[in-house]
Regions:
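Glycoside hydrolase catalytic-domain context in secreted enzymes
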Residues: 714, 736-739, 754-768
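N-terminal helicase ATP-binding lobe
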Residues: 1-316, 321-347, 359, 368-376, ...
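Elongated, non-catalytic scaffold/linker segments and compositionally distinctive motifs
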Residues: 539-549, 734, 776-783, 787
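C-terminal helicase lobe
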Residues: 370-408, 413-434, 440-666, 740-744, ...
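Generic beta-sheet signal
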Residues: 196, 300, 316, 451, ...
Length: 813
């Protein structure tokens, strides 16, 4: 639907007494512009019911008029007589226009881009990224090519991952990670793939998309479960091997004994094949909002792997810091069976505007002004739940009555309701602490406003990343004063003291609830630490005590003092089975205190380093590109910034850089016996073909060729290739030469078929590049080519025989 069509529908709706047959069509569009229009309708309906929503409506009206570049007539309506929103009206009921009317302290260019929904996409070299027949048919022939070469590398790398391996895949937001999940789930017949998703909203979103793409033939083929739903249905479907793809929350796996036991059993009899963890950086995310159940997943996974050593694990996220990678490898890899597919890239939609204030009152006034003038939907990040409540109260005083608060104090039921309303465009101001964000996949957030300084560049970037997920420009503003820097630095003092760490650890270790074995200790975390004021030793702990006790165990695990072999949740408390790696922590003496002191010092150093990196960057605003800070955190990303206080335009290090950030060589494919038979035990085979290559491609892919390389301008009818080989990769020569620069055996191994036609120059280059490679090479040509640079026929240079296609066909038919 075009902008003109949308504005015509909206204008008609207002003129026809709030009714329009075409409004239903608009509601089904599911586009950024249709969302803007529907928010206008929703807030007007609110206003008509209660005049207290007049400010909310006029804010939505400003966003609508500026985004569409239009004007509107609303019968019998009179705008507020202020300059809150830059609205101008020709008398009551007259035509309404909007002007930007932006304050001088904001970057007007960035604001305009966000209002106008400017597409922000990096320039890319076009690659020939054909789907293989398996994916083509699995997705019901909806696509013939991958979305991008990044998606192809991610999906094919995942599909080729051997049993028993863990694959970490870094791929940019919006790049199409979901296709990896779908293809893995259906790669092996009668198998189960479990996807661990951080939030219910993201779980439901992924479930709906999977059903839309896959179109399952049985009702239980794709399922999801979270607390409160019918657990019998899921457990029975697992037991009866009916599910192919199951979406779960980490809390379900840790806390629901029936679901966990059914998964462990499914692993034991080989039905449970793949464990996928989405937003995997949260698994080891540290700080005040760490997710205990996410951090305990590796212990449950150990039990699953014990039952099925062939279980594959996949860790997906858009970005990983070096520390996160190290921790994930330590906790999730077995016997060195680890592969990284790194397609890391900084976001191209984010524009940064850092605004320093002189006083608290100036900052407060600016926040109110920014909420009025910046594009919506807007997420306003604050430091604490009290700050969130105070800001909401301030907004209500000036007339905004349709905002929501999402903090660590928000209960689960209310969280679910808020997220549903947020995604359904029922409101457009979200006031949040760091508890909000991950997995809330609202695509059209136009502004992320930070009113505090986060604890690290990583946390800050993750919060900024809630915006612009539709690929359109997003403004990331931060307004701060010097007091905010002091508040950020005060976080360093929140690290547990040696006394408290020691007190919590030895209170748990020496509790009568703890069971000690020869090599293991079963620890009950519901123990009150003996340093607690007025506490009786070993009395029941409250929720805060349990959380801090878990924190200490996880901290010791991170320091490699112990490993967590199992984790369970019984009667509201976490029970850990741990293996002690450093036996010095079993004794409450000076040695143990020194060890704990060193852990505390390292924890303090890490927190201090993160905070100083961000606060130091604030001092350089305008002199240094803001995004260089992110390159320091995400070390494999190239320099890219869509705009900041130093520059308005795009700043990038390399143009059209190949997206694979490091070689992928953890394993190699083996050549099938049929292909070995065809090439007669040699490394290469030259096949002379008359006419189309397609019949030979079909036969050789059936025989087990792993990769087909075709000219970039060659069209290929995927529907005519009938192999069910899920690992088959089809690429163009541009991609092949990029992959050949380094050892990428995950993609270039086994047997590779090169379609060369009559191109002798290309043949000469291929012979040079593939010389002495470990994979088998089969060359398809129309005639024995003259290799000018070598002054020989191609058949003389190939380390193998030269055969006519009809001879090969006889051996294959």
């Amino acid at each position: 639907m075009t902008d003109n069509q949308i504005t015509e529908i909206i204008q008609q709706w207002f003129l026809d007494d709030n009714s329009c047959e075409k409004l239903f069509v608009l509601q089904t569009q599911n586009t950024t512009k249709s969302f803007i229009a529907m928010r206008l309708i929703n807030t007007y309906v609110l206003y008509k019911k209660d005049a207290k929503y007049k400010m909310d409506f006029e804010c939505a009206l400003r966003n609508y008029l500026l985004s569409f570049g239009t004007s509107i007539v609303i019968p019998d309506y009179k705008i507020i007589d202020t300059d809150y929103f830059g609205l101008i009206q020709n008398g009551t009921g007259g035509r309404i226009n909007a002007h930007y009317s932006l304050p001088l302290y904001v970057n007007s260019q960035f604001v305009r881009k966000a209002f106008e929904c400017v597409k922000c996409k990096r320039e890319e070299i076009p690659y020939s990224c054909f789907l293989n027949p398996y994916i083509y048919h699995l997705t019901n022939k909806q696509f013939k090519t991958f979305k991008s070469v990044e998606q192809q590398l991610a999906v094919m790398g995942a599909l080729r991952t051997p049993n028993g391996y863990t694959a970490l895949v870094a791929m940019s937001t919006g790049g199409g990670k979901s296709l990896m999940t779908y293809t893995l789930a259906y790669q092996v017949c009668n198998s189960l793939t479990v996807v661990v998703v951080p939030t219910i909203s993201l779980m439901l979103d992924q479930y709906r998309n999977a059903e839309r793409i896959i179109k399952p033939t049985s009702p239980n083929e794709i399922m999801y479960y979270y607390s409160g739903r019918n657990v019998d249905e899921v457990v029975n479907a697992i037991t009866q091997k009916q599910i192919r793809l199951l979406f779960l929350s980490p809390e379900t796996i840790i806390k629901n004994r029936r679901v966990r036991d059914s998964l462990l059993s499914a692993a034991g009899y080989g039905y449970f094949k793949n464990l996928v963890i989405d937003e995997a950086h949260i698994v080891v995310e540290w700080g005040s909002s760490f997710r205990m159940d996410f951090q305990c997943l590796d212990a449950i996974r150990k039990q699953m792997v014990m039952n099925n050593p062939e279980l594959r694990t996949f860790l997906f996220s858009a970005t990983f810091s070096k520390k996160t990678i190290d921790d994930l490898r330590n906790f999730y890899s077995d016997k060195g069976h680890w592969v990284e597919i790194r397609l890391d890239a900084l976001r191209s939609e984010l524009h940064f505007d850092i605004i320093r204030g002189r006083s608290r009152s100036e900052k407060s006034n600016r926040i109110m002004e920014l909420v009025c003038k910046l594009p919506h939907p807007i997420i306003i990040y604050v430091n604490t739940p009290d700050d969130a409540a105070a800001l909401q109260s301030q907004l209500e005083k000036i007339g905004f009555n349709n905002s929501r608060c999402f903090t660590g104090r928000t209960g689960n039921a209310k969280r679910k309701n808020i997220i549903e309303e947020w995604i359904d465009n029922k409101f457009d101001i979200m006031i949040a602490t760091c508890a909000f964000g991950v997995g809330v996949d609202k695509p059209d957030v136009r502004t992320v406003l930070h009113t505090y300084i986060p604890s690290s560049p990583n946390q800050y970037y993750q919060e900024c990343g809630r915006g612009g997920r539709d690929g359109l420009a997003c403004l990331n503003a931060m307004t701060y004063i010097s007091d905010d820097i002091d508040a950020a630095k005060s976080l360093m003092q929140k690290v547990l003291t040696v006394e408290k760490m020691s007190g919590r650890w030895f209170s748990m270790l020496n509790s009568d609830k703890t069971y000690k074995r020869i090599n293991e200790v079963i620890i009950d975390t519901s123990v009150k630490p003996n340093y607690s004021e007025n506490a009786v030793f070993y009395t029941e702990a409250n929720n805060a005590d349990i959380a801090w006790n878990v924190y200490v165990i996880l901290l010791f695990r991170r320091a490699d003092l112990l490993s967590i072999e199992n984790a369970s949740y019984v009667d509201g408390k976490y029970i850990f089975t741990v293996k002690i790696k450093n036996r010095s922590i079993l004794f409450n003496d000076e040695t143990a205190k020194q060890i704990i002191s060193s852990i505390r010092a390292e924890e303090f150093r890490c927190i201090r380093s993160d905070i100083l990196e961000l606060t130091t960057a604030l001092k350089k605003v305008g002199n240094v590109c803001w995004s260089t800070m992110f390159n320091d955190v995400y070390t494999l990303t190239d320099e890219y910034c869509a705009g900041c206080n130093q520059h308005d335009g795009i700043c990038k290090e390399h143009a059209n850089l190949f997206p694979l950030r490091k070689p992928v060589s953890a394993f190699a494919l083996s050549t099938t016996e049929k292909i070995k038979e065809i090439i007669g035990g040699e490394d290469e085979q030259l096949i002379l073909c008359e006419g189309s290559f397609l019949p030979m491609i079909i036969r050789l892919t059936r025989a087990g060729v792993d990769t087909v390389v075709i000219p970039d301008d060659m069209s290929l009818e995927i529907n005519q290739i009938d192999t069910d080989n899920s690992k088959l990769m089809i690429m163009g020569y541009k991609e092949f030469f990029e992959l050949s620069r380094e050892d990428n055996s995950v993609y270039l191994s086994g047997s590779i078929l090169f379609c060369l036609g009559d191109n002798s120059k290309l043949a000469e280059k291929i012979l040079l590049v593939t010389s002495h490679k470990q994979y088998c090479r089969i060359y398809l040509v129309h005639q024995d080519l003259d290799i000018i640079g070598r002054n020989k026929k191609m058949s003389e240079l190939v380390n193998g025989t030269c055969k006519r296609d009809y001879i090969i066909k006889k051996g294959l038919d």
